[in-house]
């Protein structure tokens, strides 16, 4: 690429609407790295002959980060939607053989090509909203071959689309049918065979567990965390979504990158997260879709200074959501979060939830130039509009990878 100065823009370099630069410029060298940013009036003369791109006063933020998704899977669960509307609970559907296990059947039956095509269709709307980094979990295979297949597809998405993909092994998502009544034996399989094999194949960036009364116990979760730690892999946790199981305190003991959901999180768990530097990832799409009533303890998280991230939690059963902007709106309207909180929640704090705060979530000299250009009058509009296409352009490594066609 040619060295380029992007100029006449309004810059929000760290995802906070109160920390902005009017009439700003960003200089990006031939490697795609930011070499200078600041007010246009202060642009050094050495950049005078670089290629220019005039953004005509548009807002620029760091590329968005979706830090919790289950993007790769087979089929849908639209039939369960009708059951939920009739009053059947998430837990009851799972006990009937639906829920996660029904998606496991569809995912096992699909080949890599089919999974890639389906996941690519889910990824593209996120890219068109300014997402430049995304986490993708496994967890719908629940055997070595199928988990490998999911993680390989996730890696392929990162190779073939202009987005940084981080993979999370979620083998401990549910109990596969062949292990019915033998949860400890399945944890043996995860710890002794699946996790080591997939780690050796370079398919895992982090390890997650669904710690819940319909998932895995604290003791089983700790076994998976121990296996991950032996491999030098960071951990994260689905925690306190349906009950206060104490998973967050366990996650904090292992210095987890994040604990996610957290509707039933108590103050002791919050204190443990703060001490460990664990990010709280809230998932308002799932809260909305399954009509939860227990709000996450937002005020306590604020009071203790725990960083809060937001994510789509895209999955077929509880959050078939393909919009991080709508997630921001739900964070404001359902969780009573502020605009600065939700914007940092999909930039700086989301990057921290992936352990990648040094690479994503902010625009600084020396970093890769990943940013989104917005056709809005104020940054509050990113969380205000519902369904309006707001992203004009997405730049990754200094190259425009998406441009919205107008007219």
Swiss-Prot record:
One of its GO terms (molecular function) is iron ion binding. Disulfide bonds: none annotated. Its cofactor is Zn(2+); Fe(3+). Its EC number is 3.5.2.7. PANTHER family: IMIDAZOLONEPROPIONASE, IMIDAZOLONEPROPIONASE-RELATED. Catalyzes the hydrolytic cleavage of the carbon-nitrogen bond in imidazolone-5-propanoate to yield N-formimidoyl-L-glutamate. It is the third step in the universal histidine degradation pathway. This is Imidazolonepropionase. It comes from Burkholderia multivorans (strain ATCC 17616 / 249). The lineage of its organism: Bacteria, Pseudomonadati, Pseudomonadota, Betaproteobacteria, Burkholderiales.
